[in-house]
Amino acid sequence: MAMRAVESVRGTQLKTGRNRMARGRVSANPTKAAWTQVAQKSDLEANGGRMVVETSKGRVLLQELEGEVYAVSNKCPHLGLPLVGKTALFQGQVQSGCIVCPAHGTAFDLKSGDVRGEWCPKLPNLPLVGKGPPEKPLPTFPIKIEESGAIAVDI
């Protein structure tokens, strides 16, 4: 089955060639992409469409949703806790196209990384400090899947 490249422009897909790139952020310098092979599609499927991989930029969460694969930082931008960890306590759920931080309850859009809904709904709004650091999006990364099934992330 031949796959086509998809140029990523903030959620817009343009089919352009033989590889497939999932939606995500646009590389800051597309001529100097730093593609790093991180997994095989078969590994992702064997893990239920979700896995955390180690990269030079830290841990990246690969999440399959409705036939698309997304790559986002596995570190919640609020306090740096994992979205998907090694224990049952840290297993962020996917709801309405968002990964939800298991610690604070913030929902991050898998496509854009933007916060959807309330920032840190599980935390109290404390006098003077509020809910901690200000709202920040979750970093996202362009991803491509080769015909061989190799998954690469532009970091």
Model-derived regions, located:
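N-terminal chloroplast transit peptides
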Residues: 1-21
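N-terminal pre-ligand scaffold of iron-sulfur
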Residues: 15-98, 109-110, 114, 122-155
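Short beta-strand-centered segments that line the small-molecule binding cleft or hinge
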Residues: 104
